[in-house]
Amino acid sequence: MVKLTACLLLLVAAVQAKLPVTPISQLRAESHRNKALVARSQDVNAAFPAHTIQIPIDHFPKSSRYEPHTTEKFNLRYWFDASHYKEGGPVIILHGGETSGEGRIPFLQKGILAQLAQATNGIGVIMEHRYYGGSLPTPDFSNKSLRFLTTEQALADTAYFSKNIKFPGLEKYNLTAPGTAHILYGGSYAGGQVAFLRTQYPDIFWGAISSSGVTKAIYDYWQYFEPIRQEAPQDCVHVTQNFVDIVDNIIINGKNANTTRELKNLFGLGRLRDADFANALSSGITGWQSTNWDPAISGKSFYQYCGEITSDRYLYPVTAQQKASAKRIIEAGGHGREAPEILPQLLNFVGWLNKSTLESCSGQGQTAEECLNSYDEAFYKQDNADQSWRAWPWQYCNEWGYLQTGSGAPKNIRPVISRLIDLPYTSNICKQAFGITKPSNVDLVNKYGAFDIEYDRLAFVDGGSDPWKEAGVHATAARKRGTSTNKPFILIPDAVHHWDENGLYPNETTAELPPQRIKEVQAEEARFVKEWMKVHIYIDHQTFTGIRKNLSLMNDELPAHVLPFLVPPTSTKNAVSPSHEQPADPRIAISSWACAGLSVVVARICCSPIGYRCPSRDLAAQPSKSKKDRRGQQLSPAAGDPIVCTGLTTRLGFVSFLVFAFSSFTFIPDIETLKAAVLRSGEVLWSHDAAAECCCVLSVLFAASCTESRKLRLDI
């Protein structure tokens, strides 16, 4: 039963092929489906019940954007699996994104979340996004209520979650960040979210994997169809382009009402507006996004569409009787010379659309016009608690854009959807539902880095054939990058939308499934996350006691002679700050200080600023033109990048670390004022260069061994 439910939930998440403009009937069905899922979630998912944590509705009480402010909290839902957990393991959070969290639950058992939790002895978590599923901060979806649905508020939710979470049944462990490593995973919109979280809250999140992450908000996202045009089966693409030519030549260029009427009647859509008609015809090609390597969850519509429109046989006897009308339409659309070839293709398209769409509409008691219409001002004005469809349009109308048009394609490109699908049409929902008449303020998203976003332990995994690729760091317009363990940058060939996310149970695998490229990518993700865990350091904010967390729990254990210096305390609750301990003999303090100082010198030599990146809100300032790194390269930050650490900042970081070491081993009772500098210097210690990083690790191990007599435990 659990496996069947998991399959169904994944199927729902995968096969929802989105038209450029979602018809009202689908918006209504989406709200009903969400309500039903929330109502029966506890029964269906008994193995993984929903839990809640109270989150502030408003994280920014000083911002005028959210006036009037509120101090209230709401229940945000999450699910977790601790079956792989061992003390010291990380918390792996899969960000729920712009959908109900129920659709992500199968990833607790199979897929990348389960794999990472198993590889690191961690806890797998699914965290729902505010205003989706059952995580509703407000009693309705009115504009006034939706003012709290913004990117920055959603990011702050996740940060609050990680700093305050207490998992039921695991209360004896302190599993909050940053004491426990919290690592994020997200796909698509959620992929953008986790990338932003790593750069905006680097002191909370130890790492993140952004899969098919959209980090660049684009208002007119005509590029959505470029990977389809370039990567989908070319015979299918060519036939689709011919159909689009015919439709646009008749409706846009021909302006003959009789021919337009005959074209629409051929498809049984005579009463639809022109743009709604063109939108309905795009339902086949837009199914590309829902394809997946796993046949059990892959959308079937795309390949059914392609198989039928590329056939030279008449597959539907009923539509074959309309040859005369279809031939006139082909000729009026400028493809008369190709009529013998296009005729069966066009009539098969008519038959396919009737079978895949119109029969479904009639089965629901709707006419084609009711089913495919996107104009209904009365519907759009509804904003009660049942109108959950309003959440994502609110986000893209205000901040993200992503209006998928055919009109935006350059003139030298034969589009795969009609140019009738333009900005006025795709933005109509913004105007009718929310009264928004201006383009989305994409700067509110792009300020986080857009194409240039980059950070230590921030991985990007994309599909080479993903329609959303052009909105992420692998876009044609983005700069080229290399890949490393510290900054993985992976493009999966012939993969579509976050194909690395789902997986199979062991008894479901075959020689062909998962495909080798998927197995390799998921294995690589597990590898570099384990490597990230090896250098996890946390200096306790309250006690400044370094807590070793993770190394002995990895599959590749440390040598036995190293472990005595890395024994984790059972609890830090009553730990005594090393700065408050009085050494029994002053010589111990002196030798400890000297040893710690020597380790800092070693680290300073090995870890000089080769491409350092400072955490956000750190001590670094804009480097002057005279500043160069030790390789003689100019230190100047790229647009959108975190500020490059200057030599001065690096020296300050090491000085603060040295002062911390001194105060920890001598008699200074209060070093609260040094807390910020110490925490910042810890990040500066770590170079992007693997050899230097190794040297850093050795220097801290050296310090740990020197200070064993003082019971100072260092976490690496």
Swiss-Prot record:
Active-site residues, as the UniProt record annotates them: 188, 466
Stretches for region Disordered: 617-636
Pfam families assigned: Peptidase_S28
Family to which the UniProt record says this protein belongs: Belongs to the peptidase S28 family.
GO cellular component, one term: extracellular region
Keywords associated with the record: Carboxypeptidase, Glycoprotein, Hydrolase, Membrane, Protease, Secreted, Signal, Transmembrane, Transmembrane helix
Transmembrane helix among keywords: yes
Compartment annotation: Membrane; Secreted
EC number: 3.4.-.-
Glycan-carrying positions: 143, 174, 258, 354, 507, 550
Database matches in Gene3D superfamilies: alpha/beta hydrolase
Gene Ontology biological-process annotations: proteolysis
Main location: membrane
SUPFAM superfamilies cross-referenced by the UniProt entry: alpha/beta-Hydrolases
Descriptive protein name: Probable extracellular serine carboxypeptidase
Transmembrane segments: 652-672
